[in-house]
């Protein structure tokens, strides 16, 4: 004697098993894609801040205080990122070492903080960058 519920339960069980397997796999692949993107994004941000410091007339260096927003532009070549960064003046001179850990100046004067929009192309396989746009206020 066969049980009709058992015949229906087996396909449903298989479906649940397949769906749960899909849910487990999907976040891992998305996480890998995001990790690959961030591997190229961080050096691109550093390039933008270094370019800002080189072109600035200020004797003090600025470093990033906050990434306000960022996105990858929809172009195939090169990889292009746009980012809105908040830069703040440090107590270190421009060409000192370890600017990435240099403390910020304490005063919050008008010239101590900039909000900048950078658009930068990156060629990660040859470690080359190109600044397409830089607007600061």
From Swiss-Prot:
Carbohydrate attachment residues: 36, 111
The knockout outcome noted for this protein's gene is: No visible phenotype; probably due to redundancy with other family members.
Q: What name appears for this protein in its UniProt entry?
A: Cystatin-9
Q: What is its main location?
A: secreted
Task: Write out the function statement from the record.
Answer: May be involved in testis development. May play a role in hematopoietic differentiation or inflammation. Has immunomodulatory and antimicrobial functions against Francisella tularensis, a Gram-negative bacteria.
Could you tell me the Gene Ontology terms of the biological process aspect for this record? antimicrobial humoral response
Q: Where in the cell is it found?
A: Secreted
SS bond list? 92-102, 116-136
Keyword terms: Antimicrobial, Disulfide bond, Glycoprotein, Protease inhibitor, Secreted, Signal, Thiol protease inhibitor
Q: Which family does it belong to?
A: Belongs to the cystatin family.
Report the leader peptide range. Answer: 1-31
Q: Which GO terms describe its cellular component?
A: extracellular region
Gene Ontology MF terms in the entry: cysteine-type endopeptidase inhibitor activity
**Tissues expressed in:** Expression is restricted to fetal gonads and adult testis.
Q: Which organism is it from?
A: Mus musculus
Claim: Cell membrane is one of the keywords in the record? no
């Amino acid at each position: 004697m066969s049980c009709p519920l058992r015949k229906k339960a087996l396909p449903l069980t298989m479906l649940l098993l397949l769906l749960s397997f899909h849910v487990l796999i999907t976040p891992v692949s998305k996480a890998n894609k995001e990790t690959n993107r961030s591997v190229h994004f961080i050096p691109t941000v550093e390039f933008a801040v270094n370019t800002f410091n080189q072109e600035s007339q200020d004797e003090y260096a600025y470093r990033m205080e906050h990434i306000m927003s960022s996105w990858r532009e929809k172009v195939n070549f090169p990889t292009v990122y746009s980012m809105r960064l908040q830069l703040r003046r440090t107590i270190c001179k421009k060409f000192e070492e370890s600017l990435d850990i240099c403390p910020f100046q304490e005063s919050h004067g008008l010239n101590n903080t900039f909000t900048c929009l950078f658009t930068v192309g990156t060629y990660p396989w040859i470690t080359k960058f190109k600044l397409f746009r830089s607007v600061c206020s």
